[in-house]
Curated annotation (Swiss-Prot):
Name under which the protein is recorded: HTH-type transcriptional regulator MntR
Broad class of the protein's primary localization: cytoplasm
Originating gene: mntR
Residue sites binding Mn(2+) 1 per the record: D8, E99, E102, H103
Species: Halalkalibacterium halodurans (strain ATCC BAA-125 / DSM 18197 / FERM 7344 / JCM 9153 / C-125)
Annotated disulfide bonds: none
A single Gene Ontology CC term: cytoplasm
Length: 139
């Protein structure tokens, strides 16, 4: 199981490859706002853990294992953003809130949040009911 730091790298690498078709150390460093040497160290760890294949000066590719977890991490992040928006969290705080909680939730909790998002999406009146409760609580 990857550490939270490994998850951050895998998520970003997955997104870069989806967006650009590749991910270089410099791209990862820029996206995560870290020094390239830190990226190189982490990429080597991810290589040893079979999440990716890294060839110095040539780049990296995600293994099937790396792609699977990367896709799941992106799903988790997006789901949590959607959920926080849905329940009315201020958009200025959503990214930081997601970053703060995503590594601390079990996959079971993520699945239950997914169920709740689906529950609200299937019947918009449920979300309206939530808004009414929130209005009452703000008074």
């Amino acid at each position: 199981m990857p550490t939270p730091s490994m998850e951050d790298y895998l998520e970003r690498i997955y997104l870069l490859i989806e967006e650009k078709g590749y991910a270089r150390v410099s791209d990862i460093a820029e996206a995560l706002e870290v020094h390239p040497s830190s990226v190189t160290k982490m990429v080597q760890k991810l290589d040893k853990s079979d999440y990716l294949v890294y060839e110095r000066y040539r780049g990296l590719i995600l293994t099937a294992k790396g792609k699977k977890i990367g896709k799941r991490l992106v799903y988790r992040h997006d789901l949590l953003e959607d959920f926080l928006k849905m329940i009315g969290v201020d958009s200025d705080h959503i990214y930081e809130d997601v970053e703060g909680i995503e590594h601390h939730l079990s996959w079971d909790a993520i699945d239950r949040i997914g169920d709740l998002v689906q529950y609200f999406q299937e019947d918009p009146s449920r979300l309206n009911d939530l808004r009414e409760v929130q209005k009452k609580n703000e008074e």
